[in-house]
């Protein structure tokens, strides 16, 4: 492992080539000599094991990251492999060197409160992601060829996006009166029978995890719609999982979304409780019927393959995103207006000209 200031690049113990995480085998591979290593072997060869390391007292985010501040909220770093200068924004934690193409992990940005607790590693590699993209785009019509030409496809990137996870215990209870109403018709008469019952329900459940994207930036839309992620696959965070991928750091705090999350949890519990009371009428639920306790927050990185496209002559951004765990695909595609117009003219000609010819002979 090469480490300069707070930049890390994982290197092959056999040949010194760059190591990247391989989703297909869940280990680390060298593109130069073909060696493969498990996480345990990588830690042993590097002679270091990660632990949570808080920021020194009084150290700012930029100082902890080990970079030099530049104009426009960009930070400059030196690549630990070749020394090239790399510019990133303040929330990027893993990127690529434009010169030697090795992954550079900005470890100084992953200290203290900015260090993730968990990561869901990529389960889909680039080859499979490209295959899924090709199948998906093949089902779409009138998409400009420039959206899926070789140059554009090469921009497909594996990105770890930051998420805040909320877990809690929920108690839902009700002790009230409920009515069952039955109606019987006999001729022109209708008999209505109302039975009143005392209804009691009481139960607890643990909400596994409510996930929220923890980015304020515009590119949060790339990660929103590909949810859900299976949080059962969460692993304790290790920076080596970032090798070969890009990563973003959270810039939203739990305090900024706690109200929204608690409302969602209460709505979830209320829907579960109402489903148990559907046979009764006249029961209304309030906040007192649902108690939320033992709430806790954690911070995780989730895998997304994503590609963006900006249409010529327009500021509109189109995108393709693929859940790097489940393979779920979402996207907003541009339309080739020329191809669409030609298709409409073809349909018009195929339908209108035969009708015109038929009317000539009939009339």
Regions found by a protein language model. Give the residues of each.
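Cys/His-rich metal-chelating microdomains
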Residues: 16-18, 36, 84-85, 103
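Short, non-ligating residues that shape and space the ligands of small metal-coordination modules
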Residues: 21-22, 39-40, 88-89, 106-107
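Juxtamembrane/start-of-transmembrane alpha-helix segments at the extracytoplasmic/lumenal side
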Residues: 333-344
């Amino acid at each position: 492992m090469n480490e300069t200031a707070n930049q890390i690049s994982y290197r092959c113990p056999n040949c010194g080539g760059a190591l990247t995480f391989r989703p297909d085998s869940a280990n680390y591979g060298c593109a130069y000599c073909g060696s493969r290593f498990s996480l345990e072997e990588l830690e042993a060869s590097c002679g270091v094991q990660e632990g949570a390391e808080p920021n020194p007292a009084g150290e700012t985010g930029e100082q902890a990251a080990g970079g030099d501040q530049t104009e426009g909220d960009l930070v400059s770093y030196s690549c630990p492999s070749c020394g090239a200068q790399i510019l990133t924004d303040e929330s990027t934690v893993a990127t690529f060197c434009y010169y030697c193409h090795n992954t550079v992990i900005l470890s100084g940005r992953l200290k203290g409160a900015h260090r993730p607790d968990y990561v869901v590693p990529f389960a889909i590699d680039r080859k499979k992601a490209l295959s899924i993209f090709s199948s998906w785009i093949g089902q779409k019509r009138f998409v400009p060829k420039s959206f899926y030409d070789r140059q554009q496809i090469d921009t497909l990137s594996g990105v770890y996006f930051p998420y805040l996870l909320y877990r809690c215990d929920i108690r839902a209870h009700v002790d009230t009166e409920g009515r069952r109403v039955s109606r019987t018709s006999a001729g022109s008469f209708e008999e209505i029978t109302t039975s009143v019952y005392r209804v009691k329900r009481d139960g607890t459940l643990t909400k596994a995890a409510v996930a929220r994207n923890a980015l304020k930036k515009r590119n949060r839309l790339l990660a929103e719609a590909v949810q859900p992620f299976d949080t059962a696959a969460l692993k304790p965070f290790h920076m080596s999982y970032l090798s070969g991928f890009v990563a973003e750091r959270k810039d939203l705090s739990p305090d900024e979304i706690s109200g929204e999350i608690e409302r969602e949890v209460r709505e979830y519990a209320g829907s579960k409780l109402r489903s148990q009371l559907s046979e009764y009428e006249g029961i209304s639920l309030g906040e007192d019927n649902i108690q939320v306790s033992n709430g806790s927050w954690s911070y995780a990185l989730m895998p997304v393959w994503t590609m963006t496209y900006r249409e010529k002559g327009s500021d509109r951004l189109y995108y393709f995103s693929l859940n790097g765990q489940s393979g779920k695909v979402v996207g907003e595609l541009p339309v080739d207006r020329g191809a669409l117009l030609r298709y409409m003219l073809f349909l018009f000609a195929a339908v209108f000209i035969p009708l015109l010819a038929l009317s000539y002979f009939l009339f």
